[in-house]
From Swiss-Prot:
Keyword line: ATP-binding, DNA damage, DNA repair, DNA-binding, Nucleotide-binding
Family according to the record: Belongs to the DNA mismatch repair MutS family.
GO MF entries: ATP binding; ATP-dependent DNA damage sensor activity; damaged DNA binding; mismatched DNA binding
Keyword Plastid appears in the UniProt entry: no
The organism of origin for this protein: Burkholderia thailandensis (strain ATCC 700388 / DSM 13276 / CCUG 48851 / CIP 106301 / E264)
Superkingdom classification of source: Bacteria
Residues holding ATP: G637, P638, N639, M640, G641, G642, K643, S644
Protein name: DNA mismatch repair protein MutS
GO cellular component: cytosol
Length: 893
């Protein structure tokens, strides 16, 4: 904080007049405002610029690459300054928000012409990372959440529950949840708040890197006050109708959140009209590891594409894209919602051409972002082009509703959406009459209110716009009336409007002419008519802008009662757009509607990984069958063979089915699924002081503790990072526990071939492998899942493909042969990594390997053409081509 601010504030931000005595009046005003926002950058309006002073200026100059200047002094201290043009402030605010900073926008609210001393100023809004509503500060396709966190304690003073309340201020969507303390990390990973509000005692509970943290006084989280504040906000006597009356810490969090959000906007939150209480049992559980490993909305490298979201997002509106992101992270457990969505997709695909999918999507492309426009409307910050876009959208809704109405009889969900697309009564008429067809970007620029809406404004505009013509007409009339042929009617900024007559013609001047200025060769006059026009003309533009501002404000006020209706339309448009996008993906990518069954089971016929399939020329489809008699698949095969792809595609297809999308398969059937777990990949946690193996075991522990018979578990290469015997023992024990205790659907990929003996002990386990064909010392991956275990991992061949030098590969091959001989002699599973091994002579390693027959030739010799079906023959051609290419590559080496 600036030392000047510190001088004038105590710990409770109480100001003392003595602290201001040595400062100029303007700096006194600034310092008082800054004292109210000590942790926030204050943008102080001065004419056409926003200025920042002292340490704020230094910080802004560093973050925004501004020029830091020093002008004058106050109280003997040089005033450091940095500024940005007022018309470009949004782009600078956007940069600050990305840095996690907040900014208080301090505007001039007084009239400079009438002010004595500094013009009156006040902070009209505070821009923080979690309270963004302006289009320039928001990403079109993702939401920004402000979250408040309240820790509840039991009688012993131990944290027993955490209440969460999070708000999307741009749309007004408010949600509450109460969770156990150990679930906080997963909840924050799912919500991904941009800003977290917490009292001092609760900040320690927030995991690092989960959003900007803002300290809020503890009394803001009072549960009783929060409950009452929620009732006041929603205009209800009780929260029973929302299922929130019995909540405690969540209501306390909501109270703090509403206080903070309203304070940043400087007004009430009119668009926060409902809330939703989220329960863990409502959605399929996805922990942070699963969301990351399945690459739902972000790749493992941190990019937005290629992901499931980027593949599915062909939405025509930003609202649909944001809803897609929400659906992917909130798949409902109950299949009813998904079945309704599947039915709607089918109806869209089967619709007649004139009202079909392409026609519907073409109409949706003309739709504006009604959701965010409504949010700005409720906060009275909507701009003219927001209202014109809202008008044009409402005008397009009748035709859109007609298209949906023709399809709706075949899908109940579409019937519900058709009803939601009716504009609030009177809104379209008001917007059509009041807003110009193509308004200016800002009200201050004029040209926003339509002609014919207000007679006074039309007159002021006519005066301002027709000034030149009036002067020409007056000059013509006065020449005729006075008989002075060279009489001129003109204007200058010093004397205003005047009639100029040369010295030789002054005797013809009428009596109603009043002398305004005497020149050497002429006299300048004013008449009552010209004076009246001058009074109107000189103030017409200013008065027109003021009148337009007042009319615009009245239009905003007139639209406020229709906020809920606009939100209903926005919700309907978003869902319709997303269902249409799902239908387009199903048609384009040849996806099918999945089925839901009551029995335990996952059956996927010819399933494909949706994202990988879009990236490769040819994708090999595979089946997956899990049921009460087949609960665990032990997956073996070479690295690069497709084990992880097969596992991920199974989880993604299941997730897509419950989200409500069609799926990439020939057919798919799913029983109940309550959670999806993944233990895939290797990564350490340096910040948390955890090794790769520790991270792996932590994730495995969570699965073993929480998985149920309705959970889908993906386990990939469990047991790495320690000695062979330790890893094998852990993998064996974990697989047994999943079978005997959790009894969940499990895909268990491993290179421990000893585990393939597990089905002998547990009939619910089965072996499958990813096929590959070995050619000499090379390998061709076929990516086909086949029954039974693999016979080896082909690790050396994969290393060769990766570019490991040939001498190293040959040395490894010699050493492998020795290990295999030793293993056979000792009849042990696999040797401990830390056991001493004999060294192979390096000269032997440099000897070239013996030539091997071409793999394509071997494959051809082994097949029986009479047994081939047409589809098998086609698959064989692709296989032979792959073998031929591999052989050519090996020959080049």
């Amino acid at each position: 904080m600036d030392k000047d601010v510190q001088e004038i504030t105590d710990s409770k931000q109480q100001l003392t007049e003595a602290a201001f005595s040595n400062h100029t009046p303007m700096m006194q005003q600034y310092l008082r405002i800054k004292a109210e926002h000590p942790e926030t950058l204050v943008f102080y309006r001065m004419g056409d610029f926003y200025e920042l002073f002292f340490e704020d200026a230094e910080k802004a100059a560093r973050l925004l690459d501004l020029t830091l200047t020093q002008r004058g002094a106050s109280a003997g201290t040089p005033i450091k300054m940095a500024g940005v043009p007022h018309h470009a402030v949004e782009q600078y605010l956007a940069k600050l928000v990305k840095f996690g900073e907040s900014a208080a926008i301090c505007e001039q609210i007084g009239d400079p012409a009438t002010s004595k001393g500094p013009v009156e100023r006040k902070v009209v809004r505070v821009v923080t990372p979690g309270t963004l509503t302006d289009a320039a500060l928001l990403s079109d396709k993702s939401d920004v959440f402000l979250l408040a966190l309240c820790v509840g304690h039991n009688k012993r003073g131990v944290a027993s529950t955490i209440g969460l309340a999070w708000l999307n201020l741009a749309s007004g969507a408010l949600r509450l949840a109460e969770i156990a303390p150990d679930q906080l990390g997963a909840a924050l990973e799912r919500i991904r708040p941009a800003e977290i509000l917490a009292a001092d005692g609760a900040i320690e509970a927030v995991p690092a890197g989960t959003g900007a943290i803002t300290r809020v006084p503890a009394w803001h989280f009072d549960i009783a006050s929060g409950t009452q504040r929620l009732c006041d906000q929603l205009e209800v006597a009780s929260l029973d109708g929302f299922g929130a009356q019995a909540l405690t810490s969540a209501n306390g969090a909501a109270g703090a959140l509403l206080i903070y959000a309203a304070a940043t906007q400087g007004q009430q939150l009119r668009h926060v009209r409902s809330l939703k209480v989220e329960n863990e049992s409502e959605y399929i559980g996805l922990d942070p590891s699963t969301r990351r490993n399945l690459e739902l909305t972000e790749t493992l490298r941190g990019t937005e594409s290629p992901t499931l979201y980027s593949l599915l997002d062909t939405c025509c509106t930003a609202m649909g894209s944001r809803l897609l992101r929400h659906w992917l992270h909130h798949p409902p457990r109950a299949s009813v919602a998904a079945q309704a969505r599947h039915q709607a997709i089918g109806a869209l695909l089967d619709a007649p051409v004139h009202v079909g999918l392409d026609s519907l999507r073409s109409a949706l492309r003309q739709i504006a972002d009604v959701e965010r426009i409504t949010g700005r409307l409720a906060l009275l910050s909507a701009r003219p082009r927001d209202l014109s876009s809202l008008r044009d959208t409402f005008a397009a809704l009748p035709a859109l509703r007609e298209r949906v109405a023709e399809i709706a009889p075949n899908a109940a969900a579409l019937g519900r959406l058709e009803a939601a697309l009716e504009p609030p009564p009177g809104c379209l008429d008001l917007l059509t009459r009041a807003i110009a067809p193509e308004p200016a970007a800002m009200v201050r620029d004029g040209g926003v209110i339509a002609r014919g809406y207000d007679a006074e404004l039309d007159e002021l505009r006519d005066i301002s716009e027709n000034c030149g013509q009036f002067l020409i007409d007056l000059e013509t009339r006065e020449r005729a009336r006075t008989g002075i042929p060279n009489l001129r009617v003109e204007y200058n900024k010093v004397h205003g409007f005047y009639i100029e007559v040369t010295r030789g013609q002054t005797d013809k001047v009428p009596d109603d002419y009043r002398r305004r200025q005497t020149l050497k060769n002429a006299e300048r006059y004013i008449t009552p008519e010209l004076k009246t026009f001058e009074d109107k003309a000189l103030s017409a533009q200013e008065r027109a802008l003021a009148r337009e501002r007042a009319l615009y404000d009245s239009v905003l006020q007139a639209l406020l009662p229709h906020i809920e209706g606009c939100q209903r339309v926005a919700s309907g448009l978003a869902e319709l757009d997303l269902l249409a996008a799902f239908a387009e993906r199903a048609r384009t990518l040849d996806w099918v509607a999945p089925e839901f069954i009551d029995e335990i089971g996952i059956e996927i016929d010819q399933g494909r990984h949706p994202v990988v399939e879009a990236q490769v020329e040819q994708f090999i489809a595979n089946d997956c069958a899990l049921n009460s008699d087949r609960k665990l698949l032990l997956i073996t095969g070479p690295n690069m063979g497709g084990k992880s792809t097969f596992m991920r595609q199974t989880a993604l297809i299941a997730l897509m089915a419950y989200v409500g999308s069609y799926v990439p398969a020939k057919a798919a059937r799913f029983g109940p699924i309550d959670r999806i777990f993944t233990r895939i990949g290797a990564a350490d946690d340096l910040a948390g002081g955890r090794s790769t193996f520790m991270v792996e075991m932590t994730e495995a522990a969570a699965i073993l503790n929480d998985a149920t018979p309705q959970s889908l578990v993906l386990m990939d290469e469990i047991g790495r990072g320690t000695s062979t015997f330790d890893g094998l023992a852990l993998a064996w024990a974990i697989a047994r526990h999943l079978l005997s205790h959790n009894r969940c659907y499990t895909l268990f990929a491993t290179h421990y071939f000893e585990l393939t003996q597990l089905p002998a002990e547990f009939p619910q386990a089965a072996n499958v492998h990813l096929s590959a064909v070995e050619h000499g010392h090379g390998i061709v991956f076929l990516h086909a899942v086949e029954e039974g275990p693999a016979n080896q991992s082909y690790g050396l061949q994969v290393a060769q493909l990766a570019g490991v030098p040939a001498p190293v590969i040959r040395a490894a091959r010699k050493h492998l042969a020795h290990l295999e001989q030793q293993s056979a002699a000792q009849a042990t599973p696999q040797l401990d990594l830390f056991a001493a091994q004999p060294i192979v002579d390096e000269q032997e390693c440099n000897q070239p390997p013996a030539a091997a027959p071409h793999p394509a030739l071997e494959r051809l010799l082994a097949l029986d053409p009479d047994d081939l079906k047409p589809r098998d023959a086609l698959d064989l051609l692709y296989e032979l081509r792959a073998l031929a290419r591999s052989g050519a590559t090996d020959a080049q080496r």
